[in-house]
Amino acid sequence: MNSATLTDEQLQSLDARIQSIPIVETLGMKINKLEKGHCEATVPRHKRWDGIYETFHGGMLGTIADTVTCWSILTEIGADAHVATTDFNIRFLRPCHTDVVCKAHVVRIGRTMCLARADL
């Protein structure tokens, strides 16, 4: 994991929070990059996560997008902040037959709500 905009202390705190989330281990998620307001992660494709058409199941892709956008928000508000998804929308443009690279970034930080976007 690398970062040009976060301190070593911030990275360690974020990494500890991320590694404490069970889905990270379950999916084999790897953080490629953490920057202020941005996160990039990779998830390997396994057949056990396929949907009916032998492609990465859409629900799994949604879980990945939700998780990585959360991490991008935590880079802005702190690793110890309490966060929850309140609204979620995803559009599938094509089937996924490969490992997934998810790039998420914060669009807006509000007083009580944050908006983030992910591309897979």
Locate predicted features.
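Terminal targeting signals and extreme-terminal segments of soluble enzymes
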Residues: 1-120
